[in-house]
Regions:
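Local beta-strand N-terminus motif with an aromatic residue
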Residues: 23, 105-107
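N-terminal strand-loop element at the rim of the active site
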Residues: 4-19, 23, 32-36, 52-86
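A short acidic, helix-capping loop that chelates divalent metal ions and anchors anionic groups
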Residues: 35, 138-142
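An aromatic- and histidine-rich active-site surface loop
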Residues: 90-94, 98, 107-139, 155
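A short, glycine/small-residue-rich beta-strand->loop->alpha-helix junction that serves as a flexible
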Residues: 31-45
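Membrane-proximal helix-turn-helix segments that form the acceptor-binding/catalytic region
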Residues: 148-161
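A short, charged, and often flexible helix/loop element on the N-terminal side
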Residues: 72-102, 141-147
Length: 161
């Protein structure tokens, strides 16, 4: 359930700020989409940000991993959602899609950290920001420890740095 949009004056101010910064097209990268069965507060917040930006006239594309039972490309609340790749391959494939311009041009990038980063400072040349909702700490070991202890250690190490 979405909260009401800000007033038209507030949306106009958001649009003016974005335009003044040269941000007409923004790409958002996240591990999961709002439609993922494991979506939580991070995805709800990101969806509200994307909805507000779209209502303010910003062209928003949200790239995430595949969500079972949902199309790979869809429109939601005025912004485009692209769901491709699995739980772990979304990170390198999203970066490759950005490098090749597969999802169109962008003037800025919002990277949502949900444990593992997309490492956008290494490959994105333009304005970018990271949104970090929480750290996972011991969750790495609890979730991945038995199945993939190496990946659990890598995730924990990256998050701590």
């Amino acid at each position: 359930m979405s909260a009401p949009l800000p007033s038209s004056d507030a949306l106009a101010k958001i649009g003016d700020l974005a335009a003044g910064a040269g941000l007409r097209r923004v790409h958002l990268l996240s591990w999961r989409d709002l439609e993922d069965v494991e979506a939580g507060g991070s995805e709800v917040h990101a969806a509200e940000v994307a909805r507000h930006w779209a209502a303010a006239g910003v062209d928003v594309t949200w790239r995430s991993s595949f969500a079972s039972g949902h199309p790979s490309v869809a429109m939601r609340d005025g912004y485009r959602v692209i769901r491709r790749a699995g739980r772990y391959l979304v990170f390198p494939r999203a970066a490759l899609a950005e490098l090749t311009g597969r999802h169109g041009p962008s003037d800025g990038l919002l990277e949502i950290w949900n444990g593992m980063p997309f490492f956008s400072p290494l490959w994105y040349r333009g304005p970018r920001v990271v949104m970090l909702h929480h750290v996972h700490a011991e969750m790495w070991q609890m979730v991945l420890g038995n199945d993939n202890p190496t990946l659990a250690k890598v995730g924990d190490t990256i998050e701590r740095r």
